[in-house]
């Protein structure tokens, strides 16, 4: 069959259906300075492959690469060491595919991998059931809010002010078109989360309360009180975790009464990768809610001969069967990233994960102690895992830029995450992992002393 490209008439009809007057209207959300409106600058129209590679390598050399400089960026994406065996396994031909395993008779390897992944996530989160992954943490968070609305038959979600703002923005964007109310807030710059203020916002119309653990400022708090307050009003507690390594050291959300636990799985097995692809994790504490869960579910069964096998189960929830009545519009899963996560978790084991978590926390404590000695720096947190917030007494965005020029990636400024909230502009989120050396910590402390002098 010959391929027939779109005609101008086809394009006009499609634009008319979606209410756009031109192709440019489809990209109005992309800032003009980020759009390519002509040939790539500094690159000739025609060049050999070798010349293009040389040019692009020269451009790439201007980047500050995480492994080459002291690196303290976090705020939802973390640099951890990924064993070489992870990449080796996920690149095997049996796994390196975008195919969804609808036919169990030819996909037992993939299905078993997904089943093992679900088991690991459920245990990590302290839940009974986990799905076979989602796109990333922010979309998993939204799907949890949507699920809570279906379960409770309510449409108001209360978001903690200490939830990552990118997660809040995704939720608000989706809710805008689906008739749900998102009650969000801004973070309070204080040593401990304001649990009392959060619980006071719960009412009889609330479908769920969404909290982050550890939160955007790195703080850790017992969530039992919030769970009890939510349940007393008939609402669900959704807990977001952006750093799964933390759960090797702190209590799981399910143990504290969370009904739905979601998060970002990038820390285990998946590199930073310029922001993606990442890995959404999704689990529920009580399997009575399983039919309202989004995404794929892989189950264990026996075949006609009584042999153990794996299949996609409860598929009537899904888009390929229920279409517009499906529990979500997710029509595949981040299978390869899920495999990377599962391989890394398996290589670590329970003891290895706890040791990794302990090392992350140890280095964070060393970093906090060093920065507390810098004149003009205040360490905000009473509690933290591998990430904490400092106040530097001036615009932290400028501090980050200045230190980047000195070859130190100092952290993520709250001013970058909340550009319209002036009172947050002097706060800087600093993250450490097992890849952080004591020399890196000293480099950050010395650079801050020089800049703040």
UniProtKB/Swiss-Prot annotation:
<comment type="similarity">
    <text>Belongs to the GcvP family. N-terminal subunit subfamily.</text>
</comment>
<dbReference type="InterPro" id="IPR015422">
    <property type="entry name" value="PyrdxlP-dep_Trfase_small"/>
</dbReference>
<dbReference type="InterPro" id="IPR015424">
    <property type="entry name" value="PyrdxlP-dep_Trfase"/>
</dbReference>
<dbReference type="InterPro" id="IPR020581">
    <property type="entry name" value="GDC_P"/>
</dbReference>
<comment type="function">
    <text>The glycine cleavage system catalyzes the degradation of glycine. The P protein binds the alpha-amino group of glycine through its pyridoxal phosphate cofactor; CO(2) is released and the remaining methylamine moiety is then transferred to the lipoamide cofactor of the H protein.</text>
</comment>
<comment type="subunit">
    <text>The glycine cleavage system is composed of four proteins: P, T, L and H. In this organism, the P 'protein' is a heterodimer of two subunits.</text>
</comment>
<dbReference type="InterPro" id="IPR015421">
    <property type="entry name" value="PyrdxlP-dep_Trfase_major"/>
</dbReference>
<dbReference type="GO" id="GO:0009116">
    <property type="term" value="P:nucleoside metabolic process"/>
</dbReference>
<protein>
    <recommendedName>
        <fullName>Probable glycine dehydrogenase (decarboxylating) subunit 1</fullName>
        <ecNumber>1.4.4.2</ecNumber>
    </recommendedName>
</protein>
<keyword id="KW-0560">Oxidoreductase</keyword>
<dbReference type="GO" id="GO:0019464">
    <property type="term" value="P:glycine decarboxylation via glycine cleavage system"/>
</dbReference>
<dbReference type="GO" id="GO:0004375">
    <property type="term" value="F:glycine dehydrogenase (decarboxylating) activity"/>
</dbReference>
<dbReference type="InterPro" id="IPR049315">
    <property type="entry name" value="GDC-P_N"/>
</dbReference>
<dbReference type="Pfam" id="PF02347">
    <property type="entry name" value="GDC-P"/>
</dbReference>
<dbReference type="InterPro" id="IPR023010">
    <property type="entry name" value="GcvPA"/>
</dbReference>
